[in-house]
Structures are given as structure tokens and as C-alpha cells.
């Protein structure tokens, strides 16, 4: 019988639902119902409930940056990371707690997606001169004209590294700060291209974070699983991460939740902060 249903409260009851309209067939009933809803909406002048928040199928950078919770994060001097799935709120990282960020994945497409996402956020928030990209894999050349320094494949990166080291040492000497963000799009290729020494990396990471220099290190999990002085140092000193893979498929960070995991899409990540992971939606 149409409109007949079971409703479970303390006990199961049989109920009969009635529509406020009639019609000769289902299509006519539906059409009449739509008209009735429209007239009720037009007549109602009182308060209405808020829309149920939903994570969109695809999140653009403009949509993300214009979310009220994203704007609030920026006003509070926080770096917005992504949108969590439960409350559909922006999750962000306070700059007062932001040292450096590791992006970890087992897929090249996911690494590229997360890197693009973070670069776009930085470009929305900061002057281009405050951003440097070391892009040894030449996957992000579309940003070359939008940042202060872009060092691509087969380009000399030593001069830029030396300049960063000098700025860090000068700022430490003068007890001053300078806000600057360095995105390394593939750590393995960058280490090969730059011949950076472990002590150089240590200086940039440890002294840099004291004067406002922030690195975003993007790497495949296989590189970080290797045993070199560079990888051992990174694993010991990087404790905030965007993990674009199942937590159970990596061994760098301990899982904070042991529930069943689904494979992540390229626009989904785990934000690992203070030993807890939160699943987030990022932009495409």
C-alpha cells in the first residue's frame, strides 16, 4: 500500500503517510507536490534551517579559499590545508606551530595533486616573491611565472640554496625573521640535482624554522624508506605531514585510528598533526 511504512521507536509501529496533494498518476502527483512546496516556500517569511553541509564531489581552489572557515583560518594566521568530511570544516595549521611539511605518497599522480594544491594555497595567501619552487621533475612548470624563484629540471639550484642559507644566517645574526616558503616537488631528484649535504639541510630546517623559512618536502614513500643520512634526518625531524595514501601502506607515522581504510582518491589526504590523522578533501 502506498504510503505504508514501519517506524521503529520503543516498538515497531505501522504508519500511513499521506501526501498533501492528489493526482491521476505518479507523475502528476510529483508535479503537484513540487508546486505545493514552491507555494509554501514563497509564503514562509520566518527563519529557515541551515543547509546540510556536504563535501562537494570536486573542490576548486576558489571554492575552498572562499569557504567561511577558510577565511576564518587565514584571519587567525593559520595555513588552510583541506576540508574534513564529518563537519565539512576547513582544517588548518597555525603558523605559530608550522615548522615544515612533508608530503608523502606511493603514487605520482597523488604527489602531483597535493603539490599543486599546496602551491595554489600559497599563491592565494602570499606575495609571489615569498615562494620558491625546486621542481627537478618539471611537473609544475605552470607556476614558473607566478613565484619568486622557480628552479626546474637541469637548472642550477646551488645559487638559490646558497642565497637561502645566507638569508637564514643573516636573520639569525640580526635576530630578525622573514616569511618564505620553499616547495621541493621531489626530494629524491632534488638531492641528486643539488648535491645538498646533510649538514646543509639541517641548517635550513633547524635554523630556517626559527626565522620564518618553511619547507614543503614532497617525496615518494620508497625514497623515504631508504637508509641515507638525508632520509634518516628527515624522518627524525619532520612531524607534520600530508599523507596521500592509506596509513596502513606506510611505516613512517603511527596510525591514530585502526579502523578499516579505503584507498584514497587523488584529492583526498590524511593530515598528520600532533600524532593524529584527519582525512581531508583537497582541491583539484
Label for each model-derived stretch:
Residues 66-239, 246, 283:
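P-loop NTPase catalytic phosphate-binding loop
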Residues 1-80, 225-284:
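Phosphate-binding and hydrolysis-coupling loops of NTP-dependent motor/remodeling domains
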Amino acid at each position: 500500500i502506498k504510503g505504508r511504512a514501519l517506524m521503529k521507536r520503543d516498538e515497531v509501529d505501522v504508519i500511513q503517510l499521506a501526501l498533501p496533494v492528489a493526482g491521476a498518476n505518479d507523475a502528476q502527483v510529483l508535479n503537484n507536490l513540487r508546486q505545493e512546496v514552491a507555494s509554501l516556500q514563497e509564503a514562509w517569511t520566518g527563519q529557515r534551517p541551515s543547509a546540510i553541509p556536504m563535501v562537494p564531489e570536486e573542490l576548486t581552489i576558489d571554492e575552498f579559499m572562499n569557504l567561511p572557515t577558510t577565511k576564518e583560518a587565514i584571519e587567525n594566521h593559520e595555513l588552510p590545508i583541506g576540508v574534513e568530511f564529518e563537519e565539512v570544516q576547513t582544517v588548518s595549521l597555525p603558523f605559530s606551530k608550522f615548522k615544515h611539511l612533508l608530503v608523502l605518497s606511493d603514487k605520482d599522480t597523488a604527489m602531483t595533486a597535493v603539490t599543486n594544491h599546496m602551491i595554489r594555497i600559497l599563491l592565494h595567501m602570499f606575495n609571489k616573491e615569498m615562494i620558491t619552487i625546486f621542481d627537478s621533475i618539471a611537473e609544475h612548470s605552470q607556476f614558473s611565472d607566478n613565484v619568486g624563484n622557480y628552479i626546474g629540471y637541469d637548472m642550477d639550484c646551488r645559487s638559490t640554496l646558497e642565497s637561502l642559507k645566507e638569508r637564514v644566517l643573516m636573520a639569525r645574526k640580526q635576530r630578525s625573521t622573514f616569511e618564505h616558503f620553499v616547495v621541493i616537488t621531489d626530494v629524491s631528484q632534488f638531492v641528486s640535482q643539488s648535491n645538498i649535504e646533510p649538514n646543509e639541510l639541517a641548517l635550513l630546517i633547524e635554523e630556517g624554522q626559527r626565522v620564518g623559512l618553511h619547507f614543503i618536502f614532497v617525496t615518494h614513500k620508497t625514497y623515504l624508506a631508504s637508509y641515507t643520512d638525508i632520509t634518516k634526518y628527515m624522518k627524525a625531524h619532520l612531524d607534520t605531514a600530508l599523507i596521500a595514501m592509506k596509513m596502513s601502506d606506510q611505516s613512517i607515522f603511527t596510525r591514530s585510528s585502526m579502523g578499516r581504510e579505503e584507498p584514497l582518491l587523488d584529492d583526498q589526504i590524511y593530515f598528520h598533526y600532533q600524532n593524529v590523522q584527519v582525512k581531508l578533501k583537497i582541491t583539484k
